[in-house]
Amino acid sequence: MSRYRGPRFKKIRRLGTLPGLTSKRPKSGSDLKTQLRSGKRSQYRIRLEEKQKLRFHYGLTERQLVRYVHIAGKAKGSTGQVLLQLLEMRLDNILFRLGMASTIPRARQLVNHRHILVNGRIVDIPSYRCKPRDIITTKDKQRSKALIQNYIASPPPEELPKHLTIDSFQYKGLVNQIIDSKWIGLKINELLVVEY
């Protein structure tokens, strides 16, 4: 399957709040369709919805998600926790968590258009896996800084995770360490994703 480019609010109404997909929030209890649809949920449906939350939040294709699950399965530790750590350490997600972009698709666009440097080198791959001590900056060009300036100037919607630090005057972010499981931005049962 390809990356989802359709209406985002439909997915949010169906799956709940996904901060990486869009900044919009569904009205609580006002949607009649969800009240009609809330019948008995099968185990398959529960697992599928958890997997879809993960896919749409991080902007992954089905193949990418399968690859991440395979890598997490080979690593030491809980497969679900390792999977979330791998996804949280992607460059597009780190830009979103630093507040340099409003959504993960917006962060992907910044990376694809070569506005972002990692350790002084241009990186144009949104799935680039950041490591501890990586320094993430924008190009020195005025256009690159102007794209990010609005997002850095506004207060972040949520608290900055402990594994990241940002210097908003120099348009620079630093990855201090691998993310801890309590700072993961999406509330999800990762074991259901692995079981799916």
From Swiss-Prot:
Record InterPro entries: Ribosomal_uS4, Ribosomal_uS4_bac-type, Ribosomal_uS4_CS, Ribosomal_uS4_N, S4_RNA-bd, S4_RNA-bd_sf
Any single Gene Ontology cellular-component annotation: chloroplast
Keyword Chloroplast attached: yes
Pfam family, one: S4
MF terms in GO: rRNA binding; structural constituent of ribosome
SUPFAM superfamilies per record: Alpha-L RNA-binding motif
SMART domains recorded: Ribosomal_S4, S4
PROSITE patterns with a match to the protein in the record: RIBOSOMAL_S4 (PS00632), S4 (PS50889)
Record protein name field: Small ribosomal subunit protein uS4c
Residues covered by the S4 RNA-binding domain: 89-150
Biological process (GO), any one: ribosomal small subunit biogenesis
Gene that produces this protein: rps4
Family the entry assigns: Belongs to the universal ribosomal protein uS4 family.
